[in-house]
């Protein structure tokens, strides 16, 4: 019985470690230089998550994984990606409002897919929606 409990706890711990999430927000230090009588103003951080892209291989190779499912209901847009076996590694790219800074993470082998829920009632320009939640597992 003790071995079964230990095995179950280990399996749960490994499952918990096998999730990858984009941070909800980031802080970016910007520095602008202007000539003349101009004054630089900055918007208040944090910058919220507005986009999720999955790549088959490094993002620089631009092999985007197409969503498997896109559903719209009750003010939400639900997007799912399946991650089949690939010779290249999958990468997750997280985009944020009001910045060109993005975060990228190599997804561990064995990930089956990613899911994101966007809030259709909150947009940030350039047709980007607020991400309510997302996870790859």
Language model segments and positions:
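Positively charged n-region of N-terminal signal peptides that target proteins for export
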Residues: 1-4
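Mitochondrial intermembrane space
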Residues: 18-137
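N-terminal signal peptide c-region/cleavage motif recognized by signal peptidases
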Residues: 13-17
């Amino acid at each position: 019985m003790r071995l079964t409990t230990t095995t179950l706890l280990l399996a749960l711990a490994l499952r918990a470690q096998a999730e990858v999430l984009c941070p909800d927000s980031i802080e970016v230090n910007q520095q602008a230089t202007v000539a003349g009588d101009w004054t630089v103003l900055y918007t208040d951080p944090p910058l919220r998550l507005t986009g999720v892209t999955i790549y088959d291989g490094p993002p620089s190779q631009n092999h985007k994984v197409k969503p498997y499912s896109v559903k719209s209901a009750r003010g939400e847009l639900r997007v799912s990606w399946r991650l089949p076996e690939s010779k290249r590694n999958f990468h997750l790219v997280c985009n944020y409002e009001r910045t060109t800074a993005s975060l990228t993470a190599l997804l561990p082998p064995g990930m089956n897919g990613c899911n994101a829920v966007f809030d259709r009632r909150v947009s940030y320009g350039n047709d980007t929606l607020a991400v309510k939640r997302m996870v790859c597992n």
